[in-house]
Structures are given as structure tokens and as C-alpha cells.
Amino acid sequence: IYSILNKDQINKLEQTKDLDCSYELPGVSRYRVNVCYQRGRIRTTIRTIPTEIKSFQDLGMEGGVFEKICQIPKGLILVTGATGSGKSTTLAAMIDYVNRNRPNHIVTIEDPIEFVHPDKNCMVTQREIGADTPTFASALKHVLRQDPDIVLIGEMRDRETVQVGLELSETGHLTFATLHASDAIQTINRVIDIFPPGQQSQIRTQLGFVLEAVVCQQLLK
């Protein structure tokens, strides 16, 4: 596995014993890679990332609901579901729709970058945790200096990331983000519960002002 990792990735793996990254074989495909240790040895999981971004029609998301969501000028849009439920695929379709239909600057912050979005009607800046910025929170602290209209937060993992995501939505930006939650009610509770009790009333008010949509999906087998 070391043959496909760069020096920084190898250092991170040896220090933390865990690594998430992406890898590309030009002309073949892109891959999401997880490397960890088990029983003192390296274990690797590699998943193929589709090179083609599906449209809403391709994904069976008809009826115009997702198109309307992507036309919202500002606020917070949460895409939630269990691991492997297709959140990344849905978000990629949403970002691609915006990219084709709005003249904006999109900044994505991902760990790792999965779907690559070339500039279409939008300018797209894609930043990867580890390669381009140390953490989600660090990237979000500086994102306003990059003059975005739309921000994609690959995952709201901690309190600081959630807080900055809410603040971005309050300042007139359209913010997309993912969470692990099984339904819309749990999604809202998870956002609130990540904060201490003394701050939760303020977060409820803040969330009430900025939350525009919750998309919760399940993969049917």
C-alpha cells in the first residue's frame, strides 16, 4: 500500500495508525482508500468511486424536489443516512446540478475528495483534509476569505465544525453538509446534542433560522 501513498500520508498513517485518502489511476478510475492496523499489521479497504456523476433522473430522484432544494439561495441543507447509504452520490448530484445551473463559486471540504467537479457554470474549489488543509474546522475558519457562495462540508464531525457551518449559513451562504443519522428528527437532535446543555437553546434558535432541508436516505437491499 505504501507504493500509492505520498510521504505525508505515510507519516500520518505511522503516527495515527489510521488514514483516509483517495487514489486515482488515470484513465481507469478513482478510489477511496482506508488504511488501518489490526493485530499489528496493515489492513486496507479500497472502494471504487464512480467517475460519472449521476443526474437526479439517473438516481430516480424525480418530481423536481431536489432541483428546488438546489435553487435555495442560502441556508443549511443536511444530507443524512447510515454509512454506505449513498450520501456522497446524492451530494455529488446536487453539487453538479448547482454547477450547471448557477453562476457561483463552490468550495468543497472533503475527507477525502471523492467525486471531481470540473468548472461548468460555477467555479469549483475542492479541498481535501490532509492534503490541502489539516481539519474541517481549520478549513472552515478560512473559507470566507476564499469568497464562496456555496460551501460543501463533507462531514459535520465535531462541535466546532457544526458551529462554523451554522454561522456560514447565517451569513448568506448556501451550505451543504452530511451527518450520520437515521431520520430527520434524529438529524436535528444530533446537531443540538453535540453542544453543552447551556448552549442548546441558542443552537435551536440558530438552527431554526438557517435549516432549509434535511434529506435522509436509506439504501434498500
Regions found by a protein language model. Give the residues of each.
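Short, flexible helix-loop junctions that flank or precede catalytic/ligand sites
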Residues: 1-221
